[in-house]
């Protein structure tokens, strides 16, 4: 599980400060003070980049599911007409596009801010949290559009769904992303 702990006014001997050697740019022989703080900041920036990357992967999965669903809805004939001519299929595709485009814009903004050197912890958390859940919703609708065939390996949407589900967990679950956003916006922790 991912969680946060903080210690105030708790002295830590230099030899007990945990900072990876690669974060210090040296052999890892101790570290502390400003050097450890900079290493922590650098690590968090990398984590923000990873979270934005998870958002990008999720957008790619969602877009692939949209594309597969549009293709299937145009080609599949049901009751003598294309599946895409049914109102609910069109509504699902509209919802899928809304989620995909929203996730794309949130993720691009988080990445752009990071590239400008602007603090983007909230934006990367929004992007990762929203994009991974959006990909899950989109791929679920893709399976529904494909019907029972959506669960078979004959169509790629079953794999997209599995991949989307997996992305909601690493580098902070959706719930953790929401806690980070809440803390960034309100300036207070949800737990002590």
Where are these regions (language model features)?
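Flexible, small-/acidic-enriched active-site or ligand-binding loops
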Residues: 1-11, 17
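Alpha-helical interface subdomain recognition
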Residues: 6, 25, 30, 34-192
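Glycine-rich beta-alpha junction loops
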Residues: 11-12, 59
